[in-house]
Amino acid sequence: MDPKRKPAICVFCGSSYGDDPAFREAARAIGAGIAQAGWSMVFGGGGNGLMGDVARSAQAGGAAVQGIIPAFLQALEPPISPEEKLIVTPHLQERKTLMLQLSDAFIVLPGGLGTFDEFFEVAVEAQLSVHAKPIIVVNVKGYFDALDTMLHKTIEAGFAKKTVLKLYYLADGAEAALEILEGALNAPART
C-alpha cells in the first residue's frame, strides 16, 4: 500500500437487516468508524440491508465510498444515493476481484451466503499468499461462532493447518473490530 494513500476498507455484509437490531448498530458503527479514521470504503454497491447502512454511515461521516455491483443486481439493490460512485461488473466474480484489488483490508459483518462466499474468497486467497491484507470478522452477538467452530473442526479433521486461524481476526463487536483494524493496518504484513 502506498503510504501516502489512505487505506480502503472493504466491508462484506448482508443486503438484509437480519433479525437483531444489534446487526444494524454494528454496521452503522463500522461505517462511522471508517469515516472517523479517514479511510475510504469499498462495498457491494447496494443500498439495502446492512450493506446500505454501513455505506450510508461511512458516507455521512465524510468517507469516500466505492460501490461495486454486478449489472443483474442493480434493479434489486438500488444505490445508497445518487452521488454514490458505482462500478458495474458483468458477473459476481468480477465484483469480488475488484473488491480485492481496490481494498487494503476486509471487515466481515453478519450476512447470508454472499457474505460467506466473500469471506471465504479473501481467506483462501490469503492462505494461498495472493494477498496479506487483514480480514476482521465482526462476531456480533455470536453470529460467527459456528464459523469459527467449523474452521477449528476442519483443522481437527486434518483438512487444514492451524495457520488457517491466523488468516482472520475474530472481533467481539464493531469497536473491537476497528481497534484490530487500526493495529493491523499499522503492523508489518502477516505471512
Where in this protein do the model-derived segments appear?
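Active-site/ligand-binding-proximal alpha/beta "capping" segment
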Residues: 94-129, 136, 187-191
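Flexible, glycine/proline-enriched loop segments at strand-loop-helix junctions
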Residues: 109-110, 134-138, 165-168
